[in-house]
């Protein structure tokens, strides 16, 4: 898999030097072919080839790429879904907010409800990316994000809860549109899993330190 990862990285570097026409004629067909292959290893490689060509191709080809990526998100093999989740965080940043809301948020929700915690934990980064792309004033989509955030916070898997605790400063406002919820972190500090408690306490400690540095002393008039 290391060789495959290095090959994907090399292909993406090559893509940056290709013209839009070359990307449409050679790179995109390669991406689609790998994504439709019978072997999951080929699909895993294909997952990493969507971000680099996206902005270089026509709207019609972009739509084709999104549709094919959707099939990877819903693949039967957990390894493929994991790789799709890993790359989706970068992929959504290439798109306008309207497309993210209409097409990518449903994909995110599908992954966030996956039966494998190894897939669900990767959706934390996707949540952060989506919330950065979608304007704050689009309350309907942020309502979906907030619901997903709460589900991840209360996930049955400690690995997912740990990931949320570790990235809490990123998933809290202004990104997701809710006020900072210290009680959630405080509750995490009492969870039985040591790693989750440690991560949460670290965040609370950093917040306390930051607050003490920014708080100015008050002086009374004589």
For the regions a language model picked out, list residue spans one by one:
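HEAT/HEAT-like alpha-solenoid repeats
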Residues: 1, 21-35, 59-73, 98-112, ...
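Alpha-helix N-cap/helix-start positions at coil->helix boundaries
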Residues: 1-2, 40-41, 78-79, 98, ...
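Alpha-solenoid HEAT/ARM repeat scaffold
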Residues: 5, 9, 25, 44, ...
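Residue-level signal for cytosolic alpha-helical hairpin/rod architecture
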Residues: 8-11, 28, 47-50, 66, ...
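Hydrophobic residues within the alpha-helices of tandem HEAT/HEAT-like
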Residues: 10-18, 34-35, 49-56, 72-73, ...
């Amino acid at each position: 898999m290391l060789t495959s990862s290095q090959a994907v990285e090399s292909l993406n570097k090559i893509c940056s030097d290709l013209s839009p026409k070359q990307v449409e004629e050679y790179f995109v067909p390669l991406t689609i072919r790998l994504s439709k292959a019978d072997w999951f290893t080929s699909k895993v490689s294909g997952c990493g080839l969507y971000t680099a060509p996206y902005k270089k191709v026509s709207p019609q080809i972009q739509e084709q790429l999104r549709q094919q990526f959707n099939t990877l998100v819903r693949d039967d093999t957990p390894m493929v879904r994991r790789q799709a989740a890993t790359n989706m965080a970068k992929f959504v940043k290439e798109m306008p907010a309207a497309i993210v809301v209409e097409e990518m948020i449903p994909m995110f929700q599908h992954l966030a409800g996956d039966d494998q915690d190894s897939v669900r934990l990767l959706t934390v980064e996707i949540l952060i990316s989506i919330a950065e792309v979608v304007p704050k004033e689009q309350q309907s989509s942020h309502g979906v994000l907030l619901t997903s955030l709460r589900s991840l916070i209360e996930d049955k898997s400690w690995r997912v809860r740990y990931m949320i605790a570790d990235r809490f400063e990123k998933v809290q406002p202004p990104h997701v549109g809710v006020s900072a919820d210290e009680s959630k972190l405080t509750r995490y500090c009492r969870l039985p899993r040591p790693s989750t408690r440690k991560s949460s306490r670290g965040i609370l400690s950093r917040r306390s330190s930051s607050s003490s540095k920014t708080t100015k002393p008050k002086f009374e008039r004589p």
